Amino acid sequence: PTGGQQVAALPSAGATVRELYDAGQSQLQRQDYAGAEQTFRQIIQSSPNDRLIADATFMLGESLFLRQNYSDAAASFLEVSTKYQNSARAPEALLRLGQSLAGLGEKETACATFQEVDRKYPRTASSVRQAVEREQKRVGC
């Protein structure tokens, strides 16, 4: 997309955190990962105590992961899984942290991280557990 289209998709300067978050989600869906990164960073910097901060931090990690920026993605997912460990995003953040570590060639650490998902979140959604199992096989844990 051209720069004009990206600008048009962003909410106004006075947008609420929810509006910014929704805009970032839309950017991800359109595969505008750099734009999504910028939007989620804006939320994190401007509203660090908002209830959507764990989600915004997770989605920042997604925008980085999808561009194979595994190191920065890992940092975002680690933050969600430690600082916001009780958030709904935490189990999936641990999964994505493991995937990021695998992308960095850190197989042992990735495998240990995958094991943490079930240990820390035994009641997590079956879709997350199944994804962990797939990743463990893919990585060779």
Task: Annotate each predicted stretch with a short phrase.
Residues 1-23:
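Acidic, proline-/serine-/threonine-rich low-complexity intrinsically disordered segments
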Residues 46-52, 83-89, 119-130:
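Short solvent-exposed coil/turn linkers within tandem alpha-helical repeat scaffolds
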